[in-house]
Amino acid sequence: MTLDYTEIGKRIARRRKELGLKQSEVEEKADLGYKYLSNIERSISIPSVEVIMRLAVALDTTPDEFLIGTLSHDNQEWKNISEM
């Protein structure tokens, strides 16, 4: 399976906009550097697995939504893991 980083960036941007958040707000919540989220959303930067996980927590979803475009069936289990 090949990851499409353009689609990942679009999914992250879509989720952020659904929640009505600015890029700077998400960067702060996910402890990302200035403009890094912008670069991810525009496919300039490729996020690590750790960054995708932090973005999922910041955007109240699972990494699955960004990586494959669907929510995990057990969102509560992911929330428990992410709080560890």
Predicted regions and their residues:
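Short coil turns linking two alpha-helices in DNA-binding domains
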Residues: K22, G33-Y36, S48, T62
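Recognition helix of helix-turn-helix/homeodomain-like DNA-binding domains
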Residues: D31-I46, I68
